[in-house]
Regions:
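Divalent metal-coordination and catalytic microenvironments
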Residues: 14, 35, 39, 74, ...
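His/Asp/Glu-enriched, well-ordered alpha-helical/loop segment
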Residues: 138-141, 146-151, 221-228, 233-297
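Short glycine/proline- and charge-enriched loop/turn segments
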Residues: 14, 194-202, 239-244, 312-315
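Metal-associated gating/positioning segment near the N- to mid-region
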Residues: 4-69
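Divalent metal-binding segments
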Residues: 16-26, 44-57, 78-87, 105-110, ...
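Histidine/acidic residue-rich metal-binding segments in metalloenzymes
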Residues: 87-228
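C-terminal cap of metal-dependent C-N hydrolases
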Residues: 292-355
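A glycine-rich helix N-cap at a beta->alpha junction
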Residues: 64-80
Length: 358
């Protein structure tokens, strides 16, 4: 008999849905289909796309496209620009879930390396929505100094090292308004896996040592870590097999099953999983999920994960062939069954922008 459990509305605040000029990697229908197959109600899309979401016109283009194609609820980030787009904030802030600032190398050309420009964006973002940052190593300390000065609610994405966990633990003890996210690939894999996976285990931040991985699990236990986020970032097999493979791996359909596997192994409680993928992101973004929203999971379902059967367009995963325990059987949004355990039932356009201007 299945061991079924009902989970509340899940939120992934860190995804790259691709679409638009990158629709060959994934489009807003295929990747939100991956979201509902992974149990999610809501996903928040990053701005490093083509065109990059750095101005009101590009933002409206993306809003229109996601609105027409999404099968789950959604939001999009506006991107901070190295060329200084702070003058646009008044025009876009009401339509987005937050501001994204890239402070280390990543996919796309959105890196802000100039400390003065980073500070200008911190000073200008006064809209009560989180400022989310890609910061690694010593850059984490630099961003914390801006948090300390401007007191902006700041979310640190995909933290991957023991050093960073230490900095952020101290910052939390200081009372700074920060939250911390980690990704499943950093929790389950190390640099040894990248050597075997090659480019299919290549992402930013990259995989780290076993000691770093263990520090992330320690951060979950100590509550330095608030959120587990997928950093879903699909690319085609051909791109990953090229001479210059891009960063990123898909993750929307493996995040919850991996966490449920940790529950089965006694590494996490189910309540802690719910905090990491539902309660904490809802609290940070001030979200009240609609009635009739959540997913049903079979906690005892044991199976070999087959990436060829996934909803994401790229049809591969660094976790392909891994034995998992815990499977999404149904996902509901606003009382509607959007995923039945095998097929996506919602039609493109069903998903709503939770941050739509009212």
């Amino acid at each position: 008999m299945p061991n079924l459990a009902a989970l509340p509305a899940l939120v992934d605040p860190h995804v790259h849905l691709r679409g638009l000029a990158w629709a060959h990697k994934g489009d807003f229908t295929t990747e939100t289909s991956a979201a509902v197959a992974g149990g999610y109600w809501l996903v928040c899309d990053m701005p490093n796309t083509t065109p990059a979401t750095l101005d009101p016109v590009a933002l409206q283009t993306k809003l229109d496209a996601v609105s027409a194609e999404a099968v789950c609820d959604w939001g999009v980030y506006f991107g901070a620009s190295a060329a200084d787009n702070t003058y646009t904030y008044d025009r876009v802030a009401d339509d987005v879930c937050g501001l994204k600032m890239f402070c280390n190398e990543t996919t796309g050309n959105l890196l802000i390396a100039d400390p003065q420009m980073r500070e200008k964006h911190f000073a200008a973002w006064t809209y009560g929505k989180p400022l989310v940052v890609h910061a690694e190593g010593e850059t984490v300390a630099e961003i914390l100094s801006l948090v300390r000065k401007y007191r902006r609610q700041t979310h640190f994405l995909h933290i991957s090292t023991a050093f960073e966990i230490g900095l952020l633990s101290d910052a939390k003890n200081e009372g700074l308004p920060i939250t911390v996210g980690v990704c499943p690939h950093h929790l389950w894999m190390t640099e040894d896996d990248e050597r075997s996976l090659g480019a299919f285990g290549r992402m930013k931040p990259g995989l780290k040592s076993a000691a770093d991985r263990d520090a992330l699990w320690g951060g979950i236990e100590s509550r330095v870590v608030d959120i587990v986020e997928s950093d879903h970032a699909p690319h085609t097999r051909e791109e990953k097999s090229s001479a210059a493979p891009p960063y990123g791996v898909p993750g929307l359909e493996t995040t919850l099953p991996l966490l449920l596997t940790a529950v089965a192994e006694g590494r996490l409680s189910l309540n802690r999983v719910i905090e990491l993928v539902s309660y904490a992101p809802c609290a940070l973004w001030g979200l009240t999920p609609p009635k009739g929203t959540g997913c049903m999971v079979d906690l005892d379902a044991k199976y070999v994960f087959d990436a060829s059967e996934t909803q994401t367009k790229c049809k591969w995963s660094p976790f392909d062939g891994m034995t998992l325990t815990g499977r999404v059987r149904q996902t509901f949004i606003r009382g509607v069954e959007v995923y039945d355990g095998e097929q996506v039932r919602a039609q493109p356009g069903f998903g709503k922008n939770v941050w739509a201007r009212r």
